């Protein structure tokens, strides 16, 4: 009888647990179904084609502005997902319960397939150790020491374009040249390696840079790779997965494979060169590009000196190198191209910004780190562009257990009921509403969709400061927040400011007759109407006081 009693007790406990879990999930699902959202016209595809469409900017605006701070979207085959742009809910996701809310398995697996065990492919304690090792080399103090490297690269860029303009070439693809400069900046400043000499007589395009530039558009077309990478990574040993990819008859997949192979080979080559130089001593290090001040040289030294339990294996250091190059090239260069386009469209702001730069002590050349950050309009132009046009529009999180998201302000359900918090069942797909927070009219005002750098020259609206937006940068969500925020945002900010200071003190920028279209992908990129290749041509001339 005692044995039966224990059995009945165990069954009762199991049934109670299952019933509670079922009720929680039912409640969560009923709340989710009650959240407003745009109508869906396909049970099989939901809003996927609209949201992830390269020309889906209008739909992104509709989601961000028309349905409140939390929006219900339809996924594939009747599944539901959240779009969350409520600051308090985002604080819970990114900071308060960061160990519960993690990147989707497919995202982590894709990064592991492309780079290895890098910062955006690891979780928990593994991620903490990597971040602890990397944080010092992205500090303000280290950025200050890297500034001479930045000017060295950008002054070379200026000479190349100056020669072109003097030769009568007025239409310049600013995306190409900002991309080449970004690659060389992360090469010299990040890896202590020169990818591109940026010489006046060098007309050859950089194949490595071109490959990187084509990767995000290619990734956006390979839906199966992005969605099912966590299954692909489990398909047998590495050699088997490699053979499957080699045989896969898709040009975009082959393009991605080529980029990954190139990054991996170059990272191993650079890493081995650095190890040899460090073993030979300071004199050998000083002879390298960057003179040992680059991120990887310092990181390798720090890793060697770290305690055994904090030390990273060489494979992970190499993975960080590939990630650095990949992440730093497109995001910043595309944002720079966007800024130059906006300045070409807003000539009055271009003139004011040039005046501010020329009135600095260095007149646009070799401005100190402190003075560069005191140029208020330059800072405002960068912040406003990053607010209105975040280069990465879609980042996702999935709760590893049931969670509850509190809201800053209540929302109204489809049935009119007030919703103050949202129960979220384990495994629910959530989109971080970066764009939604950045353009929300309740925070930024009725002109939130207008590019107005001057909004940063006065105190921000009280609604913005009171909202406690959990972003790591300037009350916006562009670089995310919490321990998984973009680690290189200071590097990116300094790069944009140095490029703009040097280029605007020398050149003028105007629109061409060509229609520029921006495409949503992993990183947004521009094309010319009728052409799928990433590019952004502008008319450039010599500035004459």
Curated annotation (Swiss-Prot):
Gene3D superfamilies per record: Cytochrome P450 (1.10.630.10)
Family matches, as InterPro entries: Cyt_P450, Cyt_P450_E_grp-I, Cyt_P450_sf, Cytochrome_P450_monoxygenase
Key words, A-Z: Heme, Iron, Metal-binding, Monooxygenase, Oxidoreductase, Signal
Signal peptide: 1-14
Keyword match Iron: yes
Organism domain of life: Eukaryota
Binding-site residues, heme: 486
Involved pathway(s): Secondary metabolite biosynthesis
E.C. designation(s): 1.-.-.-
Oxidoreductase as UniProt keyword: yes
Cofactor(s) annotated in UniProt: heme
GO molecular function: heme binding; iron ion binding; monooxygenase activity; oxidoreductase activity, acting on paired donors, with incorporation or reduction of molecular oxygen
Enzyme class: oxidoreductase
One Pfam family in the UniProt entry: p450
UniProt cross-references to PANTHER family, sorted A to Z: CYTOCHROME P450 (PTHR24305), CYTOCHROME P450 12A4, MITOCHONDRIAL-RELATED (PTHR24305:SF166)
Annotated function: Cytochrome P450 monooxygenase that is able to use anthracene and pyrene as substrates for oxidation.
Family: Belongs to the cytochrome P450 family.
Protein name listed in UniProt: Cytochrome P450 monooxygenase 212
Natural source organism: Postia placenta (strain ATCC 44394 / Madison 698-R) (Brown rot fungus)
Gene that produces this protein: CYP212
